């Protein structure tokens, strides 16, 4: 220092100092120092240097060596002042003051590897010992020997160290500017940090005047420095970019390449804003102090750099654009890519043509060499083979071109994989690790052919990252601890509706904010909460804004380095935190008039409740850099973990916040999109980052606010900055909230966000007083939990976001089939894999239509899995326990509109929506369709194709293009998929309780509870990229519905609890899973089936052009039981549910709802209906194997179609009402069995003209066969049940009916005449009579012209007073008119009679069927005139001129005539019920189905009980009944059913039609004009039976058919003829009073009766028991404990009392005007149009005197009738009959009277052989009479002789043969009797069997013709001789065995008498066969009649 004190001039000293500064610091200065810049005062120890410009090249080299992320582009120092206290250099501080430091920086890449920062600290810190050596060193050469320590040197070094420690540095007015210049914009952004004052000193010497001891040999391990900052502020500026000083570090070489327009996605360009002036964005209040602790010795623990800071408070005011640009700066600063890896990209070159040819040749050679030489087991791929999908090949997505060609392993091992990165598509795609196509299986070959292209770390399963290195192995590098007293961040909204002065980008807004902030920033955080700050900030910021306020913020950052791993961790905690949105509503320009509304984005409870911070954020980032040797194969791995711990907080969720915050993310999204585009064009990512975020909160209060959707155009919408929400909201309290997010950049893996919680309680509030708990979700026990594992399943919400470039497994499989397996393409027979669908792929046809059925569980699971895997956004919700409660329809309607309309229909602002979704949701934003991922396609040379052949090339090109075209049309991601899984859930709804007339009941409500177990709801929108296609699927393993129509009101629960999911005690079970006793008996129910109980699939197609939305709904219900409860019309469970669900959609602005078309297909499999009457002691169960319902529901349309298909259903009855468990096989009896039933219902709303063009309601029904299996008691029970249901017996006690007059021949009450009837019959009589018509079923047929009848003169009897003259109409009784109304005398028939054709009663049969077809002698016809006296017909000429025949006068019918169709002149009916193609088989059994009685075991087990039913013969003419095997247990019946006693009544193809016509409205009503009368039709019924049969199946009877249609050669059956036809027309009475009057017409075809005595008595007993079992009286006191019907009868007094009550009520009803509908039908006219011949055979067996008397019993037992003939004459009653019973009585009386008077000879003609004798004489008569008759007629005597001979041959010959056959059979019977007498008892001979067989042969197997008769006669004789010889030999051998020769001789002698008689038996039997063949040869009808009359052999065994 002494040299500096020499008396030198100041100029010399200044020049010397300048030289020293220039020598040591000159390379950091841009210019040489001038003398003007330097001023010195060495004596006082002060110096000053001004206007210093830094050399950025040198400074940047220093920063680059330190690995700093910044480079300096400009630097300037205003002045540097140095003060050195020479007098007290060791004890006082040296000061260095830097004034006006201005540094401009910009981000740059780090050039060195991680971990160099710590080395830079030590390199730039020179020790004092080194400095002292340099100062005292004189010679530069090295010493010859090691230097020795010098004592002076140590002292000098100690002094230097002491001085350096006492240096204090002060920065005044420092400005640090960081600029960022994005390459895609001409505007740059800059962040300036203004520091008013910054003090730097050593902590050890701060405020210490004493000398600090220093040890230069052992420097301190830690050095602590103090930084004190004051007046810190942040500023922001946007500027136009200019050419900056070039950086010394090499820039990105790829940035200089020209950007191809085709490779950049076309994003909308935003207008570049103008440069903005610099404005303040932040300020720090209070003192800021940083303590920097440096570690100088690595042996000590702790970080090398430790910074501890305390900051008073920070206030930020940032616009969304500023946030985006600042984020861009931070992102640029955080880039840490290695330049070595980037330089490696320069070696990439595109593949040329030579490379492609080389790869193709190599591939062809390797394919020809076979797989054995290609694939060598790779030990690295062994773990990969254990993956579940072992056949799946994974490859780099970008390497889908020639770079993936197969080459040898040795060649590919030395080739850089990046050599072809720029070929074809690779430079346009984001490479990622994604599943590829299944080219080859590692399991098959041991190694994939592309193993060389696989990443080396592929053996690690995805999602399971490698474990990070332990913390002990990583050394701490840096530790930062900051404590902020307070923090506020204010982000104003950007709105286009504010004035320019209020633009947040305007500097005036920021200046006003910080000016107002200065008034309260020092006392901002002094209160206990933040409520007092709201008013202050409202003054500071007049714009809507988002504000974050925090107190006691602590930030801890730590960095650790070791082993190529760089780990950083950040911990942030807030003592108190509040995030608010402040909205300034209103359009007024005055700032003070705007209302302020706050939205609590996140607020916390009072901190006094807990000492913990309210929010803690833990962030950890780990980066692993591969070593230099493995850098080519591996990539940089970056993993980040964020854990957020929150205390109890409250948040408001408003979707409109996305609009208001959209500006924050808009610029970021665009900026990110451009960076992604740069990424497409520059390089592949060299790092993959795993991001894991977790948010944990013990309790959270979430308020879901419902937005008001606005779908109008943008110009018409409300300002997006305004908050538009409903008053009502959903408040949810969530416990143990856990949000977990995991994403991986650089791959195609989905970003997943999982939310779990333990409990959720939701309360709906309307903003006023209503608070309704509506939802509760809780955790549930895990049934599969293992010991020590998780015992509970927590509710979870999983959101997955898939990149748009993701290819679904379905498309990959299709690509595999189409593009790889070319032989399969060439094979047309190979079936393609069906596309996954929620509808069943198994085609089920009904007639010509394909049934739409939901998919089975496996298909549904595949569809959901594939859809979830290929959807851009997926939502999966799992609810272990859930309970939803709707206390009223109003609450449900409000929630429906809020959730389904407001939330789902809300859309963000179009300008901001894309940016928000891309920034917040997309894992890979803006990956456009231009960069679609291609799959690998094999070269053509692999298939040995000539590449020069244009034909073959074009062929394979077409296949390839077809696959591309199909994938292009179908490929695409589904937009959104949602899946909700409910393990156990319940929905409780309180419905409105309505009484009669739909009036609401006070103080009552209905309750509905729906329980669901293992349910799943799945929905997908924009399926496979189709905007107009969506699907909805619902599945559930178990569903239970409980209902109660009326429940007394009680208070709703305050808090909703999770129920026990048991049966609610106060509700009735309605729908539930079938019990085991029911489901086990259904064929469709199998124990191993995995069908869901409920399956629903909905396809939603939206036609945007027509604005029509079509719903295709398929519902499947499997194994369910419906418990039917009879209720009032508005109290049934379905009506209450439909009324509850019938809500009104609130209108949405700008949205016009589309027209909805719903096509519904409902399928019920193995379902049942359980009905338990309240006042009837029976149980009813209806089962159906398959029930299908199809309908189309179109809103605002007039037509509705509903179709039912019922397959294999049955009805069961049981008398065991006390059984707790339903056992179908044990306790129930099947009484009704339906094979197939189809029902179609069509409704029409009508039109505006009120004139019907089609029926308002139409029902059409048809079926295959209907089986009824009943005994007398079960049939009576079925009738009782029918009456009970028809009368709604559960709702009230049915009234007591009038006892029947006569049933089954037993007179229970003397018959009454029409005049003695009471004025009003009970209503039940009319209902029963009308029920006879409504129970009919339908068929098609044809109508024939009504044959005109003979005009009958008016009989005098018709002019007499009508017997119904005393009948009074109710209206006449009410009006007091007691006069007797007499029917007006009928006018002459030719004028006044109503035309039957006009009334729709045309005849369907005539007499032509009954007359001889050869004669056609018309005896009587209208227009014939007066017949001649001699009776011979005479031809009369009415016209002398020739007759002109006009062709086509009668129009030809277009098709067969429908008998059910009314005449054309009839009006359109209002209601139509049509039954067609219904066949009914009624099986009548003996015994009893109910009760404890059991049949005789011998009879019950007889062979007939097993075979007679199944061998029942059908109709020989036609058989419409399918021989479907019936379930044996169904036909088994009850314990007392006797199967040996069985009769079958079959009605084949029954048709029925009922039409009701509208009531007349006025006088102008259209009427039917018929003559002089006008009739108003009210209803019309047609009942047609095509064939009626009664079959005899009694074991004791040999009869086959009891009753059937008679046909013969003379009387053949007409085609399409009907056996029974009944037509009824109801018209309005002439006087207009009373009920409708009816015209009844009936026709019947000829009948044949074969009556067995046992069958006759069985039918009599059956119907007698049936009549006695029908009881319609149900006492009022009968309840659930009702007595049995067979219990003790009531007392006579009780019966009389009830009868009087019933009669009194009937009389009261009679007085009412509406009682006319309950009266019996008045038949104005009854006609039996056809004369029906009946042929009767009767076979008596035994005398019975118990039931019918002695004489009648003897007559019935001994009578034998054969072809007794009787006729039912035509009937025509015009005097009127009241009631159907009177019609039946009238017909029976007329027929019996006619039979007694006129038909006794015909009946007696069939007694014994009388029929044959009569036929014999009839043939002789015809032989002589017919020639005479023919000669008298036309003179053709030869024709008469032919007719006489034919009649003689058919009548006389057949009668003679019949008589001869009877004589022979009598001889045979006598011989058989003698044979039985003479035959010895032992041994049993076979002759008895032969006799038995001959009897059967005689009855059932008569030969068909003479040839067969001769053959059977020969066989009979031959077998008789053989049997006789065999019998003698057998007797002799047995006698010899027993007694020797004596026994043999004795046996032969005993056998001689029967042997003598045996030839007579054989001869008569052979003769009988011969005679029978001859008779059948002459009369074929006789053989057919025998076949129909007698059973076959099988039926008798």
From Swiss-Prot:
Its main location: membrane. Lipid transfer protein involved in autophagosome assembly. Tethers the edge of the isolation membrane (IM) to the endoplasmic reticulum (ER) and mediates direct lipid transfer from ER to IM for IM expansion. Binds to the ER exit site (ERES), which is the membrane source for autophagosome formation, and extracts phospholipids from the membrane source and transfers them to atg9 (atg9a or atg9b) to the IM for membrane expansion. Also regulates lipid droplets morphology and distribution within the cell. Residues 17-119 form the Chorein N-terminal domain. Keywords: Endoplasmic reticulum, Lipid droplet, Lipid transport, Membrane, Transport. InterPro entries: ATG2. It comes from the Eukaryota. It catalyses: a 1,2-diacyl-sn-glycero-3-phospho-L-serine(in) = a 1,2-diacyl-sn-glycero-3-phospho-L-serine(out); a 1,2-diacyl-sn-glycero-3-phosphoethanolamine(in) = a 1,2-diacyl-sn-glycero-3-phosphoethanolamine(out). Belongs to the ATG2 family. Residues 1311-1321 have a biased composition (Pro residues). GO terms for biological process: autophagosome assembly; positive regulation of autophagosome assembly. One of its GO terms (cellular component) is organelle membrane contact site. Residues 1393-1408, 1493-1532, 1690-1718 have a biased composition (Polar residues). The chorein N-terminal domain mediates lipid transfer activity. It is a peripheral membrane protein. PANTHER family: AUTOPHAGY-RELATED 2, ISOFORM A, AUTOPHAGY-RELATED PROTEIN 2 HOMOLOG A. This is Autophagy-related protein 2 homolog A. GO terms for molecular function: lipid transfer activity. Residues 241-281, 1292-1323, 1371-1414, 1492-1534, 1684-1718 are annotated as: Disordered. It is found in: Preautophagosomal structure membrane; Lipid droplet; Endoplasmic reticulum membrane.
């Amino acid at each position: 220092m002494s040299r500096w004190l020499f008396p030198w001039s100041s100029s010399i000293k200044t020049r010397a100092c300048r030289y020293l500064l220039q020598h040591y610091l000159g390379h950091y200065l841009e210019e040489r120092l001038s003398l003007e810049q330097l001023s010195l005062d060495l004596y006082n120890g002060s110096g000053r240097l001004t206007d210093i410009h830094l050399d950025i090249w040198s400074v940047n080299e220093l920063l680059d060596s330190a690995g700093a992320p910044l480079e300096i582009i400009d630097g300037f120092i205003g002045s540097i002042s140095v003060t050195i206290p020479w007098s007290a250099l060791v004890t006082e501080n040296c000061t260095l003051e830097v004034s006006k430091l201005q540094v401009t920086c910009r981000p740059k890449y780090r050039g060195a590897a991680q971990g160099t920062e710590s080395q830079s600290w030590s390199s730039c810190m020179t020790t004092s010992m080194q400095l002292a050596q340099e100062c005292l060193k004189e010679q530069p050469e090295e010493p010859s020997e090691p230097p020795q320590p010098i004592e002076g040197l140590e002292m000098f070094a100690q002094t230097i160290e002491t001085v350096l420690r006492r240096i204090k540095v002060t920065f005044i007015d420092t400005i640090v500017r960081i600029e960022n210049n994005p390459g895609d914009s001409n505007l740059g952004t800059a962040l300036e940090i203004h520091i008013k004052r910054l003090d730097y000193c050593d902590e050890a010497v701060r405020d210490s005047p004493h000398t600090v001891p220093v040890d230069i040999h052992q420097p301190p391990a830690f050095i602590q420095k103090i930084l004190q900052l004051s007046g810190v502020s942040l500023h922001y500026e946007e500027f136009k970019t200019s050419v900056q000083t070039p950086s010394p570090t090499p820039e990105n070489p790829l940035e200089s390449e020209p950007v191809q327009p085709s490779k950049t996605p076309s994003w909308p360009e935003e207008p570049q804003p103008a440069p903005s002036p610099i404005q303040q964005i932040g300020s720090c209040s209070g003192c800021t102090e940083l303590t920097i602790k440096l570690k100088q010795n690595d042996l000590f623990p702790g970080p090398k750099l430790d910074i501890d800071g305390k900051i008073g408070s920070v206030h930020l005011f940032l616009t969304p654009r500023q946030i985006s640009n600042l984020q861009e700066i931070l992102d640029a600063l955080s880039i840490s890519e290695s330049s070595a890896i980037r330089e490696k990209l320069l070696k990439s070159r595109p593949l040329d043509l030579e490379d492609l040819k080389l790869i193709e040749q190599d591939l062809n050679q390797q394919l020809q060499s076979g797989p054995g030489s290609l694939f060598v087991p790779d030990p690295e791929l062994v773990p990969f083979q254990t993956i579940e999908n072992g056949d799946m090949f994974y490859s780099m997505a970008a390497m889908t071109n020639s770079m993936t060609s197969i080459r040898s392993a040795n060649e590919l091992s030395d080739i850089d994989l990046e050599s072809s990165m720029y070929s074809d598509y690779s430079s346009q795609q984001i490479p990622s690790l994604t599943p590829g196509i299944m080219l080859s299986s590692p399991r098959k070959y041991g190694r994939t052919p592309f193993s060389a292209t696989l990443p080396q770390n592929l053996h690690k399963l995805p999602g399971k990252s490698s474990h990070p290195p332990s913390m002990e192995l990583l050394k701490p590098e840096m530790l930062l601890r900051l404590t902020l007293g307070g923090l506020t961040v204010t982000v104003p909204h950007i709105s286009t509706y504010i004035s320019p002065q209020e633009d947040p980008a305007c500097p005036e807004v920021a200046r006003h904010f910080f000016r107002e902030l200065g008034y309260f920033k020092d006392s901002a955080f002094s209160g206990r909460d933040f409520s007092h700050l709201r008013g202050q900030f409202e003054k500071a910021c007049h714009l809507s804004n988002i504000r974050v306020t925090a107190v006691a913020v602590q930030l801890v950052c730590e960095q650790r380095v070791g082993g190529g791993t760089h780990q950083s961790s950040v911990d942030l905690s807030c003592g108190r935190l509040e995030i608010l949105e402040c909205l300034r509503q209103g359009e007024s320009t005055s700032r003070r008039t705007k209302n302020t509304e706050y939205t609590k984005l996140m607020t916390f409870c009072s901190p006094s409740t807990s000492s913990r911070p309210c929010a803690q954020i833990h962030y950890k980032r780990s980066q692993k850099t591969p070593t230099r040797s493995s850098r080519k194969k591996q990539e940089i791995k970056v993993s980040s973990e964020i854990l957020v711990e929150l205390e109890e907080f409250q948040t408001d969720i408003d979707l409109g916040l996305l609009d208001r915050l959209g500006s924050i993310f808009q610029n970021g999204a665009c900026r990110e999109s451009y960076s992604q585009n740069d990424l497409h064009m520059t390089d592949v990512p060299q790092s993959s980052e795993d991001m894991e975020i977790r948010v944990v909160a013990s309790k959270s209060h979430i308020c879901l606010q419902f937005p008001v959707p606005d779908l109008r155009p943008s110009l018409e919408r409300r300002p997006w900055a305004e908050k538009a929400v409903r008053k009502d909201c959903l408040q949810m309290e969530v416990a143990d909230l856990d949000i977990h997010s995991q994403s991986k950049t650089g791959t195609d893996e989905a970003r997943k966000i999982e939310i779990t919680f333990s409990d959720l309680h939701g309360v709906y509030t309307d903003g006023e007083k209503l608070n309704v708990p509506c939802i509760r979700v809780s955790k549930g026990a895990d049934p599969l939990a293992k010991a020590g594992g998780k015992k509970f399943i927590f509710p979870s919400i999983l959101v997955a976001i898939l990149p748009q470039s993701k290819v679904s497994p379905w498309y990959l499989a299709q690509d595999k089939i189409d593009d790889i397996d070319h032989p399969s393409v060439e094979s047309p027979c190979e079936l393609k894999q069906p596309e996954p669908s929620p509808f069943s792929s198994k085609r089920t046809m009904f007639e010509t239509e394909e049934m739409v059925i939901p998919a089975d569980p496996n298909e549904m699971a595949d569809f959901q899995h594939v859809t979830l895997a290929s959807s851009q956004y997926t939502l999966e919700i799992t609810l272990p326990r859930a309970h939803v409660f709707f206390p009223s329809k109003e609450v449900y309607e409000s929630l429906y509109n809020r959730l389904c309309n407001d939330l789902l229909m809300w859309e963000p602002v179009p300008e901001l929506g894309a940016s928000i979704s891309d920034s917040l949701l997309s894992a890979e934003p803006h990956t456009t369709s231009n960069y679609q991922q291609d799959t690998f396609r094999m070269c053509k040379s692999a298939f040995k194709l000539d590449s020069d052949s244009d034909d073959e090339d074009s062929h394979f090109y077409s296949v390839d293009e077809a696959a591309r075209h199909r994938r292009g049309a179908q490929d695409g991601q589904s937009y959104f998929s949602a899946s909700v899984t409910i393990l156990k859930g319940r929905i409780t709804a309180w419905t409105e309780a309505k009484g009669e007339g739909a009036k609401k009941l006070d103080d009552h409500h209905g309750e509905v509870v729906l329980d669901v177990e293992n349910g799943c709801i799945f929905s997908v929108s924009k399926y496979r990229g189709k905007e107009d296609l969506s699907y909805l699927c619902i599945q559930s393993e178990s569903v239970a519905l409980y209902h109660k129509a009326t429940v007394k009101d009680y208070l709703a629960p305050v808090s909703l609890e999770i129920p026990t999911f048991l049966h609610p005690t106060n509700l009735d079970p309605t729908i539930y899973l079938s019990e085991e006793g029911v489901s086990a008996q259904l064929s469709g129910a199998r124990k191993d089936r995995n069908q869901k109980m409920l399956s629903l699939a909905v396809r939603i197609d939206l036609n945007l052009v027509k604005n029509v939305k079509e719903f295709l709904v398929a519902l499947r219900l499997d194994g369910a039981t419906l418990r039917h409860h009879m209720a009032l019309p508005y109290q049934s469970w379905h009506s209450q549910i439909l009324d509850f669900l019938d809500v009104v959609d609130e209108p949405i602005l700008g949205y016009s709802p589309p027209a909805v078309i719903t096509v519904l297909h409902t399928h019920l499999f193995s379902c049942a209906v359980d009905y338990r009457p309240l006042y009837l002691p029976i149980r009813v169960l209806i089962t159906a194997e398959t029930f299908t319902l199809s309908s189309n529901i179109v809103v605002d349309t007039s037509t509705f179609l509903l179709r039912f298909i019922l397959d294999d259903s049955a009805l069961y009855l049981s008398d065991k009402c006390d059984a707790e468990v339903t056992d179908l096989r044990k306790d129930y009896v099947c009484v009704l069995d339906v094979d197939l039933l189809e029902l179609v219902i069509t409704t029409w709303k009508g039109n505006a003209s009120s004139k019907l063009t089609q029926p308002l309601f139409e029902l059409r029904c048809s079926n295959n066969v209907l089986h009824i299996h009943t005994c007398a008691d079960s049939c009576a029970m079925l009738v009782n049940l029918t009456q009970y249901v028809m009368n709604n017996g559960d709702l009230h006690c049915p009234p007591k009916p009038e006892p029947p007059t006569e049933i089954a021949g037993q007179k229970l009450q003397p018959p009454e005449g029409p005049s003695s009837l009471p004025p009003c019959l009970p209503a039940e009589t009319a209902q029963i009579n009308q029920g006879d018509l409504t129970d009919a079923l339908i068929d098609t047929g044809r109508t024939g012209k009504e044959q005109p009848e003979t005009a009958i003169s008016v009989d005098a009897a018709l002019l007499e007073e009508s017997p119904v003259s005393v009948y009074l109409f109710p209206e006449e009784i009410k009006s007091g008119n007691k006069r007797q109304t007499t029917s007006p005398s009928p006018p002459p028939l030719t004028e006044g009679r109503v035309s039957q054709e006009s009334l729709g009663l045309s005849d369907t049969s005539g007499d032509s069927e009954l007359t001889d077809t050869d004669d056609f002698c018309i005896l009587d016809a209208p227009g014939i005139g007066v017949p001649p006296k001699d009776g011979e017909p005479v031809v009369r000429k009415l016209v002398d001129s020739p007759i002109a025949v006009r062709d086509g006068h009668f129009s030809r019918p277009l098709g067969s005539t429908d008998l059910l169709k009314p005449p054309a002149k009839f009006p359109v009916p209002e209601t139509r019920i049509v039954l067609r193609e219904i066949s009914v088989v009624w099986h009548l059994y003996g015994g009893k189905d109910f009760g404890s009685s059991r049949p005789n075991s011998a009879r019950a087990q007889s062979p007939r009980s097993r075979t007679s039913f199944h061998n029942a013969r059908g109709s020989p003419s036609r058989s419409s009944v399918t021989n479907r095997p019936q379930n044996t247990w169904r036909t088994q019946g009850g314990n007392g059913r006797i199967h040996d006693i069985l009769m079958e009544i079959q009605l084949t193809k029954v048709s029925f039609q009922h039409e009701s016509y509208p009531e007349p409205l006025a006088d102008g009503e259209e009427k039917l004009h018929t003559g002089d009368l006008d009739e108003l039709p009210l209803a019309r019924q047609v009942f047609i039976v095509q064939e009626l049969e009664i079959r005899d199946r009694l074991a004791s009877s040999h009869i086959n058919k009891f009753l059937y249609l008679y046909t013969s050669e003379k009387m053949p059956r007409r085609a399409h003829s009907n056996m029974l036809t009944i037509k009824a027309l109801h018209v309005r009475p002439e006087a207009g009073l009373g009920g409708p009057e009816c015209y009844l017409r009936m026709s019947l075809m000829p009948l044949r009766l074969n009556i067995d005595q046992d069958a006759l008595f069985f039918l009599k007993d059956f119907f007698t028991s049936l009549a006695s079992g029908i009881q319609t009286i149900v006492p009022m006191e009968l309840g659930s404990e009702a007595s049995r019907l067979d219990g003790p009868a009531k007392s006579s007094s009780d019966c009389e009392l009830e009868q009087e009550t019933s009669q009194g009520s009937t009389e009261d009803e009679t007085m009412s005007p509406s009682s006319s509908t309950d009266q019996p039908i008045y038949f104005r006219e009854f006609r039996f149009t056809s004369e029906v011949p009946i042929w009767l055979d009767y076979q008596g067996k035994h005398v019975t005197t118990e039931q019918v008397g002695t004489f009648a019993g003897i007559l019935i037992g001994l009578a034998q009738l054969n072809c007794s003939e009787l006729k039912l004459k035509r009937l025509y009653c015009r005097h009127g009959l009241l009631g159907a019973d009177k019609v039946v009585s009238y017909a029976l009386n007329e027929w019996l009277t006619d039979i007694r008077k006129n038909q006794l000879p015909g009946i007696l003609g069939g007694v014994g052989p009388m029929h044959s004798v009569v036929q014999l004489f009839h043939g002789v008569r015809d032989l002589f009479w017919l020639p005479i008759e023919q000669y008298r007629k036309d003179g053709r005597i030869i024709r008469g002789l032919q007719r006489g001979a034919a009649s003689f041959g058919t009548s006389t010959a057949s009668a003679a043969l019949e008589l001869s056959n009877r004589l022979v059979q009598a001889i045979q019977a006598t011989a058989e009797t003698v044979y039985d007498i003479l035959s010895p008892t032992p041994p049993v001979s076979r002759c008895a069997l032969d006799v038995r067989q001959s009897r059967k042969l005689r009855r059932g197997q008569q030969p068909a013709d003479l040839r067969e008769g001769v053959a059977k006669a020969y066989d009979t004789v031959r077998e008789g001789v053989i049997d006789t010889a065999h019998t003698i030999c057998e007797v002799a051998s047995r006698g010899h065995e027993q007694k020797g020769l004596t026994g043999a001789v004795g046996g032969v002698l005993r056998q001689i008498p029967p042997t003598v008689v045996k030839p007579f038996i054989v001869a008569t039997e052979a003769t009988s066969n011969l005679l029978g063949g001859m008779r059948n040869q002459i009369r074929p009808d006789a053989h057919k009649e025998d076949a129909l009359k007698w059973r076959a052999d099988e039926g008798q065994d």
